[in-house]
A protein has these predicted regions:
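Extracytoplasmic/secretory-pathway segments with low complexity and glycosylation-like composition
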Residues: 1-214
Length: 214
């Protein structure tokens, strides 16, 4: 069992013309963004479930190692990958991220200082590079959470088509589980959704806890 405390302060939106303030509004809810989580000292092989402020947020969490089924081509390290959603509309997930080396764990996305030894989903050794039969896609979760609605953002769902923008490679998301690796750690990204619709939960600004429970 592990957890991460996330602190998001209240914000004000202000528009000024010369020295005169024309609007000033309290922003009571958290803005949409991705947050990286890196939990350690967990039980290897355990599937855990994420909660934020006591609410199940499994659908908004993406593991660093995404389980995929390749459909064409081979992904390349450093390229951007985008999602093709299963459905249209405001409820459809949108995802845009950078591909890290397949066994990357810590360090630069293309030059890891620590690597994964095994695939946490099947216990097999992880290859040193991507190929046409790769079963995981390693996402650079650091850049994904680097800034509020920056270049990279979003979340995915099972069945989503992922497309490499440089390689043209395609794969479908075969499963989305948070499983502790053999080194007792788990890395992933939590997406705080847009608050413009009641379809997604809203989280008040302030001190909120992100927890993982088995």
């Amino acid at each position: 069992r592990g957890g991460t405390r996330t602190i998001v302060h209240e914000e004000y939106e202000k528009t000024s013309i010369t020295d005169r303030t024309v609007s000033r509004d309290l922003v009571p809810f958290m803005r949409s963004r991705n947050i990286e989580f890196n939990s350690k000292k967990l039980k290897p092989g355990t599937q855990v479930y994420p909660y934020f402020d006591g609410i199940d947020v499994s659908r908004y969490c993406t593991p660093k190692l995404i389980e995929i089924t390749m459909t064409s081509g081979t992904f390349t390290v450093g390229e951007n990958v985008r999602s093709v959603p299963l459905k249209k509309g405001i409820s459809a997930p949108v995802f845009y991220a950078r591909v890290a080396q397949i066994n990357h764990k810590e360090g630069e996305y293309n030059s890891a200082t620590r690597t994964y030894e095994q695939n946490p989903y099947n216990g097999q050794l992880i290859a040193s590079s991507y190929n046409s039969t790769s079963t995981v896609l390693n996402i650079d979760t650091y850049s994904l959470s680097n800034e509020t609605q920056g270049e990279y953002y979003g979340y995915i769902e099972v069945g989503t088509l992922l497309v490499g923008e440089s390689s043209g490679a395609t794969a479908t998301v075969s499963d989305l589980k948070l499983v502790v690796d053999n080194q007792s750690s788990l890395i992933g990204s939590f997406y705080i959704p847009e608050t413009i619709t009641s379809y997604h939960p809203r989280f008040e600004s302030g001190i909120r806890s992100f927890t993982l429970s088995s």
